[in-house]
């Protein structure tokens, strides 16, 4: 099995606790509400929402994909960290076994948040991950993040 690791870091004006509540804890409700063309729904197939939980994410009509399944590894509400794996679905190509994601939201000195993400692609055999595959995923995630950030700015009393 081969692999590829991609790290990214960006900032937000939204405080880390508020952003974590929306971006991680309530994403299954918030994203279909603000971006139904991207995510139609999210449902828990196994578990209680904590570590070990398996979720099915059904994409909206504007997506090239039908669904994916996530397995949650950890959620740390105090340290604002979250990790899960994409374990099934048509977003995984024939060459990718799974993708592990780790997200950490760090309070920034200016009152906002530094968002640190790591994506680990586990390939079947020694297949190389195409840069455009990673770039496309990054752009979609960035777009969703900007929608969440915009929603929080437009609704300052939510997720406090």
Swiss-Prot record:
GO terms for biological process: abscisic acid-activated signaling pathway; defense response. SUPFAM superfamilies: Bet v1-like (SSF55961). GO terms for molecular function: abscisic acid binding; protein phosphatase inhibitor activity; signaling receptor activity. One of its GO terms (cellular component) is cytoplasm. Pfam families: Bet_v_1. It comes from the Eukaryota. Keywords: Allergen, Pathogenesis-related protein, Plant defense. Monomer. Belongs to the BetVI family. This is Major strawberry allergen Fra a 1-D. It comes from Fragaria ananassa (Strawberry).
């Amino acid at each position: 099995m081969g692999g590829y690791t991609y790290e990214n870091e960006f900032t937000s004006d939204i405080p880390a606790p508020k952003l974590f509540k929306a971006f991680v804890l309530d994403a299954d409700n918030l994203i279909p509400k603000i971006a139904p063309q991207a995510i139609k729904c999210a449902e828990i197939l196994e578990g209680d929402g904590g570590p070990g939980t398996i979720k099915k994410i059904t994409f909206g009509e504007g997506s090239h994909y039908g669904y994916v399944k996530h397995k949650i590894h950890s959620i740390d509400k105090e340290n604002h960290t979250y990790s899960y794996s994409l374990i099934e679905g048509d977003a995984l190509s024939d060459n990718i076994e799974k993708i592990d994601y780790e997200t950490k939201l760090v309070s920034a000195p200016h009152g906002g948040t530094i968002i640190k993400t790591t994506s680990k692609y586990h390939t079947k055999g020694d297949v190389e991950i195409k840069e455009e595959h990673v770039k496309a995923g990054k752009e979609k995630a960035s777009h969703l993040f900007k929608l969440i950030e915009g929603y929080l700015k437009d609704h300052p009393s939510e997720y406090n």
